Amino acid sequence: MRSGVITQKLGMTSIYNDTGERVPVTVLRLENCQVIAQRTVEKNGYTAVQLGVGLAKFEKTSKALRGHFSKALVEPKAKIVEFRVSSDNLLDVGTEITVEHFVPGQRVDVTGTSIGKGFAGVMKRHNFGGHRASHGNSITHRAHGSTGQCQDPGKVFKGKKMAGHMGQVRVTTQNVEVVSIDVDRGLILVRGAVSGSKGAWVLVRDAVKKRLPDNAPRPAGVRSPANVKVKPATPIAEVSVAEGVE
């Protein structure tokens, strides 16, 4: 099981495939997505990676998070999410995941927060048909009608469809197709609509109900860590002098 990624929704557009078919796509941007912590079986009882994405202002970051980011040698992140992974797919702290983590044609599960609609009636919220427009009806044109029975059971059952707050909930869309990726601009184009407003954070993971393509990179499509310290090579002049002395 590989790690997912944190992307930002830019909006929707449409492209044309090789057969001339118009394909509606949602554009997701993956930028500065780095591993900031690991979870191991020995220390935590499970394996996972904690990812951070975006850039947050230092003065608006709490002291606890400042220490968390400085320990990982990464800049403060705007969004932090933890993804469960298998032990063979653990990533080193500081590793940056790129859009090459996914391949065109792959199926993914996309999770976002739906757009809030406020307090909505049953016709908008649950697609009720409503009551008659005339012929003696008044006031209750868009009402839900009966909410239960009489003395027995004497209550409204849980889950009864009624008016209430609509939207602003976590929604996962499964088996969404990755149409294409743009490595230079860090974009992922997925088929169809994705829950969330423009600029919202969207989680993208490998589909749990589809087989991972053989050409998908394992453990992830990564860029070299920025915090890896390279040991400086010995100057050529010093080597020649040392050899001459010997």
UniProtKB/Swiss-Prot annotation:
One of its GO terms (molecular function) is structural constituent of ribosome. One of its GO terms (biological process) is translation. Gene3D superfamilies: 3.30.160.810, Translation factors. Signal peptide: none annotated. The keyword Glycosyltransferase does not apply. One of its GO terms (cellular component) is cytosolic large ribosomal subunit. InterPro entries: Ribosomal_uL3 (IPR000597), Ribosomal_uL3_bac/org-type (IPR019927), Ribosomal_uL3_CS (IPR019926), Transl_B-barrel_sf (IPR009000). The modification N5-methylglutamine is found at Q151. It holds the Pfam family Ribosomal_L3. Keywords: Methylation, Ribonucleoprotein, Ribosomal protein, RNA-binding, rRNA-binding. Methylated by PrmB. The keyword Metal-binding does not apply. Part of the 50S ribosomal subunit. Forms a cluster with proteins L14 and L19. Belongs to the universal ribosomal protein uL3 family. One of the primary rRNA binding proteins, it binds directly near the 3'-end of the 23S rRNA, where it nucleates assembly of the 50S subunit. This is Large ribosomal subunit protein uL3. The gene is rplC1.
